[in-house]
């Protein structure tokens, strides 16, 4: 009886798997290197990611009366109702004391400035963006200590 049952299972499994290709017939594609040269579309999107939209439309390179050339700006996006933003504020105050006029911090309340938040793709709060010469140096979408911000800024001064 056991032999008959084993034979029936073997015959049924043979008919069930008759359409499955044999492993010998399967052709493996050559392994591609994960590091490939950037194509023109990748370069375009990389350039778009690194360039920062202007805060105010003007023919000069000034934001709020401050020349953007060789100046580091910290854009700080927050909301009054955000608990982590309330913790981030004092950290930025420490940063202002450390660097003085070398670093300019612009605080942007997303409840009052929704357009700017949309242009900068703000998805989480608090968000801190460090910019120099209109290029994003760092973007943090979480709470960041003043020591972490200081080390990032010192690399680019």
From Swiss-Prot:
Signal peptide start and end residues: 1-22
Residue span, Thioredoxin domain: 46-157
PROSITE patterns (alphabetical): THIOREDOXIN_2 (PS51352)
Presence of keyword Electron transport: yes
Knockout or disruption consequences: Mice of infection with knockout parasites have reduced blood parasitemia due to a slower growth at the ring and schizont stages. Parasite burden in vessels of lung and adipose tissue is reduced. Also, the development of experimental cerebral malaria is delayed. In infected host erythrocytes, surface expression of parasite antigens is reduced.
Gene Ontology cellular component list: cytoplasm
PTM section of the record: The disulfide bond between Cys-82 and Cys-85 acts as a redox-active center and is reduced by thioredoxin reductase TRXR.
SUPFAM superfamilies: Thioredoxin-like
InterPro entries, per the entry: Thioredoxin-like_sf, Thioredoxin_domain
UniProt keyword annotations, A-Z: Disulfide bond, Electron transport, Redox-active center, Signal, Transport
Disulfide bonds: 82-85
GO molecular function, one term: protein-disulfide reductase activity
Active site (catalytic residues): 82 (nucleophile), 85 (nucleophile)
Entry superkingdom: Eukaryota
Family: Belongs to the thioredoxin family.
Function: Participates in various redox reactions through the reversible oxidation of its active center dithiol to a disulfide and catalyzes dithiol-disulfide exchange reactions. As part of the translocon PTEX complex, plays a role in the export of parasite proteins into the host erythrocyte. The translocon PTEX complex is a multi-protein machinery resident in the parasite parasitophorous vacuolar membrane, responsible for protein secretion into host cells.
Entries under PANTHER family matching the protein: GEO12009P1
Quaternary state and interactors: Monomer. Component of the translocon PTEX complex composed of HSP101, EXP2, PTEX150, PTEX88 and TRX2.
Name of this protein: Thioredoxin 2
The species this protein was found in: Plasmodium berghei (strain Anka)
């Amino acid at each position: 009886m056991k032999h008959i049952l084993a034979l029936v299972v073997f015959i049924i499994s043979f008919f069930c798997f008759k359409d499955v290709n044999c492993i010998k017939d399967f052709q493996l594609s050559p392994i591609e290197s994960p590091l490939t040269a950037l194509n023109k579309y990748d370069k375009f999107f990389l350039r778009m990611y690194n360039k920062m939209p202007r805060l105010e439309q003007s023919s000069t390179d000034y934001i709020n009366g401050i020349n953007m050339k060789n100046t580091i700006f910290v854009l700080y996006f927050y909301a009054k109702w955000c608990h982590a933003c309330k913790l981030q504020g004092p950290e930025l105050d420490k940063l202002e004391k450390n660097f003085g006029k070398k670093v300019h911090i612009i605080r942007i309340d997303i409840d009052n400035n929704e357009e700017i938040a949309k242009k900068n793709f703000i998805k989480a709060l608090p968000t801190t963006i460090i910019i120099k010469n209109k290029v994003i140096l760092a973007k943090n979408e979480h709470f960041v200590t003043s020591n972490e911000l200081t080390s990032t800024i010192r690399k680019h001064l």
